[in-house]
Amino acid sequence: MVKAKIAVNGYGTIGKRVADAVQAQDDMEIIGVSKTKPNYEAAVAHQKGYDLFAPASNSGAFEKAGIPLAGTIEEMVEKADLVVDCTPGGIGEANKPMYEKAGVKAIWQGGEDHELAGFSFNAASNYEGALGRDLVRVVSCNTTGLCRVIYPIDRELGVKKVRVTLARRATDPNDIKKGPINAIVPDPIKLPSHHGPDIKSVLPHINITTAALKIPTTLMHLHTVNMEVNTDCTAEDINRIFSSQSRIRFMSQGINSTAEIIELARDMGRPRNDMWENCIWPESITVHEREFYFFQAIHQESIVVPETVDAIRAMMELESDGAKSIQKTNKAIGL
Ligand SMILES: NC(=O)C1=CN([C@@H]2O[C@H](COP(=O)(O)OP(=O)(O)OC[C@H]3O[C@@H](n4cnc5c(N)ncnc54)[C@H](OP(=O)(O)O)[C@@H]3O)[C@@H](O)[C@H]2O)C=CC1
Ligand SMILES: O=C(OP(=O)(O)O)[C@H](O)COP(=O)(O)O
């Protein structure tokens, strides 16, 4: 089988995970990854066997650091069928003309606006809509986690209203530049947070608003989700619907915090402690009339990674059935 040629522009928190997940599939392969700085991440990418590309103006720095380059970012893009842009939020927009000039398909992550790609993706919610598309945005980690729970509930019970409060991890574990250290920060103060409108970019008919707070932790986000539905239901019904979703995992056996979830991922031998699934506490599912609540934790560094693989498969038309793609992606990465 000829594999789809995938480039990762921006080998950071998301990019390095996307590269490994793509490489684990049998219908796509990584032809290159990019960095701007010749630091430890660039050295490890080279050690792993990835061809490394950088802006032409930075090639001297890589040479000085003894990290070999395979070429410039433009040259990497020319070799690819599809580029996954994992540059920091707001940077990826400037790369669109480069992708258009090279005639390659492109995926952006949730730090970019919906309008840049014109299609926002979540595998369970709208896989088929991405079939054959040239430009797609995979929605952000929190938005992905919310789509994964709202879509199946809407399909089975009809969602009337969703209200969510998100406690957002302040920054990623490797990031030493950002805070907060001793504060809780409304993020943003002006409501709603971007997540509600972003859900509507995937599921336009859902009545949803969201509020988010940044808290001094790096491990995971935590959501308090409140949904009103159109159909009578019990906690067992909600439990059954969530159980049918392969990217939802129930937390039990003494797991009462995000710290223990990450320890579970370590104990399971997951790469980089990644927890690709929404982590829901079934005990928290509480129904009153047609309204219910629950808690879920979201591992921000990894949740969008299987979704990105599915987006590639849809855009390259390697699989027309979303459920089959989800199954294939999960199996290859060990989910
Ligand atoms: N981190 C998270 O929790 C999540 C992030 N996202 C989204 O994913 C995207 C990427 O975020 P994240 O992985 O955290 O970002 P990181 O800062 O961890 O990584 C960004 C990468 O892009 C590279 N880079 C920076 N500038 C350029 C450039 N001009 N051209 C090419 N490469 C560049 C950096 O390389 P170098 O260091 O060499 O400069 C780095 O490897 C954003 O849209 C973000 O919103 C989505 C879900 C979760
Ligand atoms: O996609 C994310 O969060 P989001 O879903 O709240 O936008 C990631 O955790 C990145 O968030 P950041 O913009 O705080 O680095």
From Swiss-Prot:
Residues annotated as binding D-glyceraldehyde 3-phosphate: 140-142, 171, 195-196
Name of the protein described by the UniProt record: Glyceraldehyde-3-phosphate dehydrogenase
A Gene Ontology molecular function term of the record: 4-hydroxy-tetrahydrodipicolinate reductase
Catalytic activity: D-glyceraldehyde 3-phosphate + phosphate + NADP(+) = (2R)-3-phospho-glyceroyl phosphate + NADPH + H(+); D-glyceraldehyde 3-phosphate + phosphate + NAD(+) = (2R)-3-phospho-glyceroyl phosphate + NADH + H(+)
NCBIfam families the UniProt entry points to: GAPDH-II_archae, PRK04207.1
Enzyme class per UniProt: oxidoreductase
SMART domains: Gp_dh_N
GO terms for cellular component: cytoplasm
Residues that coordinate or bind NAD(+): 13-14, 111, 169, 300
Alphabetic keyword roster: Cytoplasm, Glycolysis, NAD, NADP, Oxidoreductase
SUPFAM superfamilies: Glyceraldehyde-3-phosphate dehydrogenase-like, C-terminal domain, NAD(P)-binding Rossmann-fold domains
Family of the protein in this entry: Belongs to the glyceraldehyde-3-phosphate dehydrogenase family.
BP-aspect Gene Ontology terms: glycolytic process; lysine biosynthetic process via diaminopimelate
Assembly notes: Homotetramer.
EC numbers, comma separated: 1.2.1.59
Organism: Methanosarcina mazei (strain ATCC BAA-159 / DSM 3647 / Goe1 / Go1 / JCM 11833 / OCM 88) (Methanosarcina frisia)
Residues the record marks as active site: 141 (nucleophile)
Subcellular location: Cytoplasm
The protein's annotated pathway: Carbohydrate degradation; glycolysis; pyruvate from D-glyceraldehyde 3-phosphate: step 1/5
Origin superkingdom: Archaea
